[in-house]
Amino acid sequence: MFLKKTIETSEHAESYYAASGSWQTDYPELEGELSVDVVIIGGGFSGVSTAVELCEKGYKVALVEANRISWGASGRNGGQLIGGMGHNPDSFIRTIGRDGVEAIYQMGDEGVDIVKERIEKYGIDCDLKWGYCEAGLKPRHLRAYKKWAEEDEDIQLLDKSQLGEFINSDLYLGGYYKSNWGHLHPLNLCLGEAKAAENMGARIFEQSTVKKITYGNNPAVYTEKGTIKA
C-alpha cells in the first residue's frame, strides 16, 4: 500500500511548548534495513505510549516519525490531563446505556492514572500541576455539571461564591472542581516518554516519512532510505 504525500515540514511550529521544550530531539533518519517485533508509525502520544508499553513487555520496537517526536497535535494541545466526556451524558445513555457511560468515565480516570504513574516511574519533567476547574456562564452549563457530578463522585460542584476561591472573576454563575485532574506540558511529556522507550531499547527515527507498507506474512514499512521488517 502506497501512502499519500505528507506535508513537507520537519520542525516544530512556533509555540510556547516548543520554545520551552526540555530538549530538541535529534533522532537519526532511518537508513538501511532493520528487523523488529513491532514497528510503530508516528511519534505522537499514541505511537510513543505504545512504544513504552511494548518495551516494558520485552518487545523489540522501532518507531518512525515523518517530522519530530510530538510534532503534531500531541506537542501543541491544551495540556489538560483530564477524563470525562465533555458533553451531557444523557445523549450517550440513550445509545450505550448507563453502564457504557460509567465505563467511559472509568477509562478516562484510568488514563489519567497511567500518565501519572508513567511520569513518576520515568522521572518525566513536564510541569504537572494537579487541580482542574471549569466555570459556567449559563444555567445550562450548571445543569450539565450537575449531571456530570452524578456520574463522577470526585466532582465538587461550586456555586458563585465558592468559585471565587479558584478564579478572580465574577462573570460566572458557578462551576466544578476536580482535584485528581490537572495540567501539564504535553510536548515535554511526549519527549520524556520517547526517552523512556529509547532507554528500554526502542529504535526511534525522525525525518523518516513512510512511503509504503506491505502486509501478510512479511510485513514491512518503507521510507525513502530504509526498510523495517516486523
Predicted regions and their residues:
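Extreme N-terminal leader/targeting segments of oxidoreductases
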Residues: M1-V38, E56
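Hydrophobic alpha-helical packing residues
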Residues: E53-L54, D152, A197
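Dinucleotide-binding Rossmann-like beta1-alpha1 core, especially the glycine-rich loop
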Residues: G84-Q162
